[in-house]
């Protein structure tokens, strides 16, 4: 029989949200268990293949104001938190460069009009800078003479996704987080089989928690679905970009994020598909051809990885935190394509809810974060408390 250990919080899922939450909660003094169905490298998570761009203004062209605001708050948190980690993580705030070929000039007008419609006016005025061809070359010498115009979105940034995942886990473990790897499919009520009894369960499983996010009554859209994202990693020592670059195109808009050691992450927008099979030849050609059109030296790059991952997405494309006060379960989901951009602010709010539950607050869903992010935190009732507590061993 498995010996049972008691914890304040059991976190299901060790992707980006789970690791951020574990690190925050253990530093607050909580006893934390982190349970993951796979291994510690995080290779099965959407965060593992992400470009990890921190670009709230650029994303405002395709996202809602809530994402922009969460992103602004999260970049501040990343700056502070990464400085506190004992392991260095690549992080920069040198801006985003947006370019387009002459025949696609109309895409620039659409891009800027969407930004101005969604982003805070002060953010646009502070960060948006129009460039002529000379200015593009001054910002990115590797692109000198290649584009007659561009936009610099100052202050935007990026980080090393895999370095962040490693550092967060290492720090959390050193602070005392108890980890269970290769746990398979685990629910809140099966934790005792792993030797875990927890006062509060924080569910950060992404698509692994699909059953807990059903469709709305009478609705046909799934409460949580996966949207396919495709990313190529290449080694391109002859390119020499210094910041993320977005290439506007009516059919194949791409982003290219330079990482340390001449690595580049090349990706595009998501596909409306639950398919997680390997990348198609067509997709690979589109991404790599677009990169080659940005800089011909990508033609000599070495392809290291062709990655596919599904991003957990709610019908409104916004993140949500659901709080079952009776069952003492908090669920975080729906970070969609904005994981690294918004995860710090979202998990900070979720950890505030968990902290309120641990303190016995009868209205844990109404923490100050609920006022800051209206509608993101929702009180729900999933199951009778006594039944769930009996299953998890909380009543003894």
Residue ranges of each PLM-predicted region?
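Helical element adjacent to the flavin cofactor pocket in flavoenzyme catalytic cores
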Residues: 147-198, 204, 208-211
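C-terminal catalytic lobe of FAD-dependent flavoproteins
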Residues: 301-396
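Helix-loop-beta segment of a Rossmann-like dinucleotide-binding subdomain
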Residues: 87-101, 124-174, 269-273, 330-333
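Dinucleotide-binding Rossmann-like beta1-alpha1 core, especially the glycine-rich loop
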Residues: 51-139
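N-terminal Rossmann-like FAD-binding beta1-loop-alpha1 element of flavoenzymes
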Residues: 7-33
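Active-site substrate-recognition segment that forms the wall
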Residues: 23-27, 37, 48, 53-54, ...
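Conserved Rossmann-like nucleotide-cofactor binding loop
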Residues: 17, 40, 208
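Short beta-strand to alpha-helix junction loop
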Residues: 62, 66-72, 103-107, 151-167, ...
């Amino acid at each position: 029989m498995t010996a049972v250990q008691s914890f304040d919080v059991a976190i299901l899922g060790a992707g980006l949200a789970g690791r951020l939450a574990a690190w925050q909660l253990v530093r607050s003094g909580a006893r934390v268990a982190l349970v993951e169905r796979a291994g510690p490298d995080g290779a099965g998570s959407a965060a593992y293949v992400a470009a990890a761009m921190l670009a709230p203004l650029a994303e405002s062209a395709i996202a809602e104001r809530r994402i922009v605001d969460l992103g602004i708050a999260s970049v501040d948190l990343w700056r502070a938190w990464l400085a506190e980690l004992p392991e260095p993580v690549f992080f920069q705030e040198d801006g985003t460069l947006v370019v387009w070929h002459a025949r696609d000039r109309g895409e620039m007008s659409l891009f800027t009009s969407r930004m101005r419609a969604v982003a805070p006016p002060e953010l646009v005025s502070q960060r948006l800078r129009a460039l002529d061809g000379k200015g593009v070359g001054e910002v990115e010498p590797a692109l000198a003479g290649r584009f007659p115009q561009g936009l610099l979105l100052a202050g935007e940034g990026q980080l090393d996704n895999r370095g962040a995942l490693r550092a967060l886990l290492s720090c959390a473990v050193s602070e005392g987080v108890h980890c269970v790897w290769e746990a398979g499919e685990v629910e809140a009520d099966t934790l005792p089989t792993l030797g875990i009894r927890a006062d509060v369960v924080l569910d950060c499983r992404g698509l692994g928690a699909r059953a807990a996010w059903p469709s709305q009554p009478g609705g046909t859209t799934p409460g949580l679905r996966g949207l396919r994202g495709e990313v190529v990693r290449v080694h391109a020592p002859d390119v020499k970009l210094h910041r993320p670059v977005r290439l506007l195109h009516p059919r194949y808009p791409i982003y290219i994020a330079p990482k340390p050691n001449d690595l580049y992450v090349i990706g595009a927008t998501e596909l409306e598909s639950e398919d997680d099979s390997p990348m198609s030849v067509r997709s690979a050609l589109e991404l790599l051809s677009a990169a080659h059109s940005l800089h011909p030296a990508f033609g000599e790059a070495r392809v290291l990885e062709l990655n596919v991952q599904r991003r957990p997405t709610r019908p409104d494309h916004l993140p949500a935190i659901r709080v079952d006060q009776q069952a003492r379960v908090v669920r975080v989901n729906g970070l969609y394509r904005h994981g690294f951009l918004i995860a710090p602010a979202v998990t900070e709010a979720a950890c505030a809810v968990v902290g309120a539950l641990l303190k016995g607050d009868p209205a844990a869903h109404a923490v100050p974060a609920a006022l800051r992010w209206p509608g993101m935190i929702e009180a729900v009732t999933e199951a009778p408390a006594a039944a769930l507590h009996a299953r998890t061993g909380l009543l003894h």
